A protein has these predicted regions:
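Surface-exposed, charge/polar-rich loops and edge strands
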Residues: 1-344
Length: 344
């Protein structure tokens, strides 16, 4: 299977550059199994589309302002993108510079303080920050939000609220779990009234999510690692939902990635640690019955994942419909409610 199998042409004007004024006003394409027709709805219609006893699983990661700028003591400019906080004022980062920094090198940060290069881990570096607050707290005012590269503007104050889900809690992501951005408190309240249950996992979206697949032969692709936590409470909610014939619905591909990584011996088990799972057609997703997901980049691993879930032909048919109907694409764009193709 090749990366080029997942290419499609997208008019640039359909790439959403900013969120809508109201989170749940985003459009929602309902994609049932073929040959049923697509329907064009809005995210705020979800209470009508779901059933009492359904379980929505959200990713409660919180985005950190992970982009920093500075200069080496030699004078060269440096851009830093934090991949993961390691504790003890240390972080694993990506560094953009004209020359790779060496261990022991010091970066003077534009927002005050400095960072020492402790070493290298593949494409990443480990830095120790010398700043006057705990690193996580310092980043809140010193860091810049790392909007995806296809959003062609600088982040503003509004992005600090809108590029964050309303249920974000566990600090550690460098990108938002974007399907969750569509949910606001009024919608969550209406879903509760409908009898829909909620659960949470944590997956800290890493900088690798911005990296393109660099090989055409997908068997040679090395998937990036991300930290996840699937707790015992969520596992019990899933078990109870299944026992009562409810549906487990993932809010986003990050939730699917976390749940699939926590499957053991035919069932979901509590799990905390790193995942490197790569889901593409041929893999059967067993942990969820439907998912809400945004529209993904051509040739991306996320497009491959949803193709594994609903069938590549069905997904590409849905994307053609979305382009024709002028849906908004990518992180600040619209969403789909996606159901799997029946087996056989």
């Amino acid at each position: 299977m090749k990366k080029s199998d997942f290419h499609y042409e997208l008019p640039e004007e359909l790439i959403a550059q900013a969120p809508l004024a109201e989170r749940s006003a985003s459009r929602l394409m309902v994609v049932p199994p073929a040959p049923a027709a697509f329907s064009d709805r809005h995210v705020r219609d979800l209470p009508e589309l779901l059933q009492p006893g359904d379980l929505l699983v959200f990713n409660d990661t919180r985005v950190i302002p992970a982009r920093l700028f500075g200069q080496k003591t030699s004078g060269g400019r440096v851009e830093i993108l934090i991949e993961r906080l390691l504790g003890g004022q240390q972080a694993r980062v990506q560094i953009g510079a004209s020359k790779s920094p060496k261990p022991g090198g010091v970066i003077l940060l534009d927002t005050g303080g400095q960072a020492e290069v402790l070493g290298r881990e593949g494409e990443f570096y480990v830095l120790r920050f010398e700043v006057d607050e705990p690193l996580e707290k310092w980043l809140v005012h010193a860091g810049r939000l790392p909007l995806p590269p296809y959003i062609q503007r600088e982040p503003d104050q509004a992005d600090r609220e809108r590029y964050q889900t309303v249920f974000a809690k566990e600090v550690g992501a460098v990108a938002a779990p974007t399907a969750g951005l569509h949910f606001d408190e009024p919608l969550l309240a209406r879903l509760r009234e409908r009898g829909v249950e909620f659960g949470h996992v944590t997956l800290h979206v890493g900088a690798g999510t911005f990296q393109p697949v660099r090989v055409d032969e997908l068997s040679q692709h090395v998937m990036h690692r991300e930290w996840i936590n699937v707790g015992a409470e969520l596992v019990e909610k899933v078990r109870r939902t299944r026992a009562n014939s409810g549906r487990v619905i993932a809010i986003g591909t990050t939730v699917v990635r976390a749940l699939e990584s926590a499957l053991r011996d035919g069932g979901l088990q509590p799990f905390s640690g790193e995942t490197q799972i790569f889901i593409l057609p041929g893999y059967r997703i067993r942990s969820v019955d439907a998912m809400v997901t945004n529209f993904h980049l051509p040739e991306s691993t996320l497009l491959m994942m949803i193709s594994a879930f609903a069938g590549k032909e069905r997904v590409f048919e849905a994307y053609r419909h979305a382009i024709h109907q002028r849906y908004r694409f990518f992180s600040y764009g619209d969403a789909m409610l996606l159901f799997p193709q029946p087996e056989g």
